[in-house]
């Protein structure tokens, strides 16, 4: 009888402790959309990726061009991606380098989406099966990574990139990396 109660009690206490730790982090002003990532401080995973329109193959050297870049994970099935798309177009017009990762999507739908809504990406990579997303630790779309000019990931953000997120969170990191290059 005591053993039957011990497992649920331990599980309950573990969940309660995790909840309290997260509440404390939020109260201290930590950004709940900033996901911890084992890849922060490490290079973009090495993988051969195909470009959406030209079927050209890229390696992680794409992220080693000497300038920082946003790696934006998106999909046509993602309503939040639709919401952020107009703002990404604005950033691209301002000169922000953005590489798109079309995540678990159908290529014809993605090409039509970009034709109809505009293409903010310098390069659009296909990840139809989600294997590169898995390597990045992506669990949904949209997610955005800030990568420096040497291909090292500096930040990971889950959610839509909008004016507030850009100016308060992402832009300071992007600008700092731009100055260092």
UniProtKB/Swiss-Prot annotation:
Disulfide bonds join 78-81. The keyword Secreted does not apply. One of its GO terms (molecular function) is disulfide oxidoreductase activity. Keywords: Cell inner membrane, Cell membrane, Cytochrome c-type biogenesis, Disulfide bond, Membrane, Redox-active center, Transmembrane, Transmembrane helix. Residues 24-181 are periplasmic. The chain crosses the membrane at residues 5-23. GO terms for cellular component: outer membrane-bounded periplasmic space; plasma membrane. The keyword Signal does not apply. Residues 38-175 form the Thioredoxin domain. It is found in: Cell inner membrane. It is a single-pass membrane protein. One of its GO terms (biological process) is cytochrome complex assembly. Residues 1-4 are cytoplasmic. NCBIfam families: dsbE. Belongs to the thioredoxin family. DsbE subfamily. Involved in disulfide bond formation. Catalyzes a late, reductive step in the assembly of periplasmic c-type cytochromes, probably the reduction of disulfide bonds of the apocytochrome c to allow covalent linkage with the heme. Possible subunit of a heme lyase. This is Thiol:disulfide interchange protein DsbE.
């Amino acid at each position: 009888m005591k053993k039957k109660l011990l497992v649920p009690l331990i599980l309950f206490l573990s969940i309660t402790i995790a909840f309290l730790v997260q509440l404390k982090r939020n109260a201290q002003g930590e950004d709940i959309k900033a996901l911890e990532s084992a890849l922060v401080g490490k290079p973009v995973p090495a993988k051969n990726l195909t470009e959406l329109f030209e079927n050209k193959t890229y390696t992680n050297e794409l992220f080693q061009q000497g300038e920082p870049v946003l790696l934006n994970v998106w999909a046509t099935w993602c309503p939040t991606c639709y919401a952020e798309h107009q703002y990404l177009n604005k950033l691209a017009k301002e000169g922000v380098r953005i590489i798109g990762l079309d995540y678990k999507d159908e290529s014809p739908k993605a090409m039509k989406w970009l034709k109809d809504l505009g293409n903010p990406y310098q390069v659009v990579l296909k990840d139809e099966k989600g294997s590169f997303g898995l390597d990045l630790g992506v669990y949904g779309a949209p997610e955005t990574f800030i990568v420096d000019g040497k291909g090292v990931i500096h930040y990971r953000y889950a959610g839509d990139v909008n004016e507030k997120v850009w100016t308060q969170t992402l832009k300071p990191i992007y600008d700092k990396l731009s100055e260092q290059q």
